[in-house]
């Protein structure tokens, strides 16, 4: 959070340009609607329903679900016809039909691949929803922080406005020099610039907020809540790592790779074919009977398809096994990354909680005491204005550091 205010002079112009550009694009791409105030839960529901990435992920799930029936593809049925002297010197006709098929486990394994791909797509959808909800949480946190910063700056501005008024009176009556008046004016100028910057940053956050919600008929405003961080401790629960959407998705990718390996091994199984043929016969038959063209005879065919040349099949199996190993290593790497990330954030969080307790128990009361005593001494003429400004700025810095 300190980034917004530690380098104001460097980034102020860049921020103004970004806000202006995004605002212009937003204005040009949609009509103007009255903003509707919503809370975080309402925002998540709207975003899940409208966000483009979520829509794409949903379509991917539907696509994979529709692909499951592809597993039972038997291939084309072959229908053939014969005309000519294929039985004797006479002209005969023949009709045939045949179908190739695999063993039942081949189709079962193919179905398993498509089902696992659907589960992987569902886990990606869940991950996308989680990332979207997390970004919305961050946006609300950022907005509430900026809102709290704005309130603090306004209180400080009100304080310096009062002191500027007193400084002008003191300068006009000859009780102070121009340095005191100029210093008071500059304090208000600085606060005005920070207030303007904070307002622009809040606008920028709302632009991204509405982009995530992707509602073409309504613009939304963020409902401000009390700014705080202690309620986020549940995010640091280490027992939830294995249920993290990224790990769940990585696990389904492993299972999908295993299913693909089994499906590739099905190439080593024999295939089968069955057929039926009906032909005519004319002339003297082997049974000493003379047949006309209207007499027809039937036969059945059964075949076995053996994978004699297996080099390509074994190569496909090896490739699938390597992909399985790749996904397993990806899972372990992602797990370690999440554990390390959680450990780092836990250390940072615990340190920040310690600092917050110190601020609330000691620094903030001290800041209030510094402010109260400084005001009394300044009003009584016991300290000059510059000493007063130093003390007040010290109290303000404590409040800013606590908020940051």
Task: Give each language-model segment a name.
Residues 56-71, 128, 132-151, 169, ...:
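Amphipathic alpha-helical coiled-coil segments
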Residues 115, 178-186, 318, 385-393:
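Short, charged, amphipathic alpha-helical segments
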Residues 1-41, 48:
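Bacterial Sec-dependent N-terminal signal peptides
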Residues 3, 10, 131-245, 345-348, ...:
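Periplasmic alpha-helical coiled-coil/stalk elements that build and connect Gram-negative outer-membrane
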Residues 32-78, 101, 109, 175-179, ...:
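Bacterial Sec-pathway N-terminal export signals of envelope proteins
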Residues 55, 74-92, 100-129, 147, ...:
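Small/polar (Gly/Ser/Thr/Ala-rich) solvent-exposed segments
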Residues 124, 207-217, 263, 268, ...:
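Long amphipathic alpha-helical coiled-coil segments
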């Amino acid at each position: 959070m300190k980034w917004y205010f530690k380098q104001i002079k460097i980034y102020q112009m860049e921020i103004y340009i970004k806000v202006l550009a995004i605002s212009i694009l937003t204005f040009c791409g949609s009509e103007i609607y009255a903003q509707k105030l919503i809370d975080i839960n309402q925002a998540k529901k709207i975003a899940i329903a409208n966000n483009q990435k979520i829509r794409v992920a949903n379509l991917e799930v539907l696509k994979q679900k529709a692909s499951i029936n592809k597993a039972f593809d038997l291939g084309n049925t072959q229908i053939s016809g014969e005309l000519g002297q294929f039985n004797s010197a006479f002209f005969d006709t023949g009709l045939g039909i045949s179908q190739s098929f695999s063993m039942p486990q081949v189709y079962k394994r193919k179905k398993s691949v498509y089902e696992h791909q659907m589960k992987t797509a569902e886990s990606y959808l869940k991950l996308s929803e989680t990332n979207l909800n997390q970004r919305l949480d961050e946006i609300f946190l950022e907005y509430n922080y900026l809102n709290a910063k704005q309130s603090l700056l306004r209180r400080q501005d009100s304080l310096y406005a009062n002191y500027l008024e007193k400084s002008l009176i003191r300068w006009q009556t000859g009780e102070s020099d121009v340095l005191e008046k100029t210093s008071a004016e500059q304090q208000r100028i600085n606060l005005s610039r920070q207030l303007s910057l904070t307002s622009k940053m809040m606008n920028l956050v709302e632009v991204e907020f509405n982009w995530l919600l992707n509602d073409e008929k309504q613009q939304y405003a963020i409902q401000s809540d009390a700014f705080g961080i202690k309620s986020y401790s549940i995010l640091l629960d280490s027992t939830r790592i294995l249920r993290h959407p990224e790990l769940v998705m990585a696990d389904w990718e492993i299972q999908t790779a295993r299913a693909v390996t089994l499906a590739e091994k099905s190439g080593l199984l024999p295939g089968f074919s069955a057929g039926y043929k009906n032909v005519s016969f004319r002339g003297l038959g082997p049974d000493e009977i003379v047949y006309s063209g209207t007499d027809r005879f039937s036969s059945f065919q059964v075949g076995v398809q053996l994978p004699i040349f297996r080099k390509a099949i074994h190569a496909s199996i090896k490739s699938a096994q390597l992909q399985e190993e790749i996904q397993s290593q990806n899972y372990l790497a992602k797990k370690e990354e999440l554990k390390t990330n959680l450990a780092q954030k836990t250390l940072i969080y615990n340190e920040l909680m310690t600092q917050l307790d110190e601020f609330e128990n000691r620094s903030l009361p001290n800041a209030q005491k510094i402010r109260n005593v400084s005001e009394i001494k300044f009003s009584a003429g016991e300290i000059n204005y510059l000493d007063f400004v130093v003390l007040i700025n010290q109290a303000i810095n404590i409040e800013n550091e606590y908020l940051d």
